[in-house]
């Protein structure tokens, strides 16, 4: 199944609410949903920093649960969902998504990582 097919499935199932496929230079090559005031480049920039400081997006603070160069998992302790990211293995970029609180952060990461693995250059 293609990236687009699996991404549509993840959106339809409620695993992803908003998502962006970003190049390493922060060009948006794919997106789904919208989030007023959210800037995916800010998320990517914060992810790449070595500090484990919270990420604030559109006025919501997300606490970092785990962060490596390949993985970002953060959650809003007020129950406003998660910001999750995975570096693509076959494409020089990143998949960054907001996932609802009904999906656990680690399950959300698993979904996003599987999608990121489907992205082809």
Swiss-Prot record:
Compartments, as annotated in UniProt: Cytoplasm, Cytoskeleton
Principal subcellular localization: cytoplasm
Alphabetical list of InterPro entries matching this protein: PFN_sf (IPR036140)
Keywords: Actin-binding, Cytoplasm, Cytoskeleton
Superkingdom: Archaea
GO annotations of cellular component type: cytoplasm; cytoskeleton
GO molecular function, one term: actin binding
Entries under SUPFAM superfamilies matching the protein: Profilin (actin-binding protein)
Residues making up the signal peptide according to the UniProt record: none
Function: Binds to actin and affects the structure of the cytoskeleton. At high concentrations inhibits spontaneous rabbit actin nucleation. This strongly suggests this archaea has a profilin-regulated actin system, and actin-type genes can be identified in this organism.
Family named by the database record: Belongs to the Asgard profilin family.
Protein name: Heimdall profilin
